[in-house]
Amino acid sequence: MENNCYFVCSRSILKSCDFHSPNPSSSWCYDTDYLISMINGNNMFDTMSIYICTDVIPFFTNDILPKLKHSFYLVSGDSDATVPHGHIDLWHGNRYPLKEEYCLEILKHPKLIKWYAQNCILEHNKIHQLPIGIDYHTISKDPNKFWRDSEANEGSSPKFQEMILKNIRKEMIPFYKRIPKIFVHMTNYTHRQDDLNLIPQELIEINSNTMPRTKVWKEMVNYSFAFSPWGNGPDCHRHWELLCLGCIPIIKSFGDNKMFKNLPVLIVKEYSDVTQELLDKTLTQFKVMNFNYNKLLLRYWVDKFSSPPSL
């Protein structure tokens, strides 16, 4: 089960909440039965944690929020939509933007303790960025996914996938002893090519081969840096894979960036800011810094919405 994983991962966060969908579907705005059951049941309590898909926020605001009488943590994600303004129900033919007023309505609710949101670009003292982490659920749900190295007879469970990651970590060397270039792995990168073109080509090492994720992971640990553009939302599973594998992801800024504070991440306003001088300076600075690698762990984040509020 994902909620027993070591590293932070999207579905592990979901399954660690007190109330969550028993059959989650990413970016699905109609997954609401468990919320209705929660309201109609008699098992709510103070400081409970409620997980919702980002796409469910309008329903939650209109139909669930007014009925909440207990203090609660809200945790949202399992979607590419930004909070706010992202397009929700993106994959099911009914695309529309997530209005900021829904988010503000939640934030002013007197029983809200804090809201932890994936792909969050809204700044408010009660809302905090939450990582999407590693993706274990795709291969677990579909063992035939090309990401899985079937030739190596890899298992598909979250536990097995995490074992692969841990084994690669055992062999990796520090980022400052690696090839000081920017690793790029993209097989279908038309919409990201503009960003990549802004980086001097002599600084990058491109691998455009389609290959299982394990082989990509083994490539990552050879390099100090990696190009890590936004996914369909600003956060991306690749960001967290790179961090777990000791590589410095180069990421365009979004929101308040506090999620990446005290982690070895090179945040730029534009990829045109990337130069040899910047890479050299970053390696020199990061080599002597003490980072908080606990932020890569599931427990670090779950503890934030599992403990009672501070008095």
What feature does the model see in each segment?
Residues 1-267, 272-311:
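Nucleotide-sugar donor-binding catalytic core of glycosyltransferases
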